[in-house]
Amino acid sequence: MKAFLIIIMLAMVMPTLGPKRGSQMGEEIRKLEEEFGKAMIQNDAEAIGRFLADDWIIIDPDGGIIDRARFLGVIKSGALTHQAMDSTDMRIRIYANTATVTALTTSTGKYMGQEFKTQERATDVFVKENGQWRCVISQLTRFAGK
């Protein structure tokens, strides 16, 4: 009976412990996403690189895969610049040392001299290693609006 009461008490307490930790980590991820957006607008390849794992890739809306070196090279060259990058409907999920983020992102800028405005569903997957979150993969899907 005593063991049963302990289990019941733990069951009542555990839900209050988990979300607090998860929401703290979720806030860390939200801040990283905001800082990443600022670095993109500033065209700061060095700062952007600090958010990305060495083996990071992005899957573009056409299904192409771009690795970290190529992506940062495009940023450094100035071929891709952003004037704005705004994310809404951000959903963050934490799983131990992994986090997923989905958001609706609207961006304006220039690519190879051509102006663009995009609206995409973006997904980022972060892994926490040695106390630091790094994005390991990003994926973009055109948003048609629904």
What are these regions (language model features)?
Residues 4-5, 20-146:
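A beta-strand edge to alpha-helix "cap/lid" segment located at domain peripheries
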Residues 6-15:
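Bacterial N-terminal signal peptides
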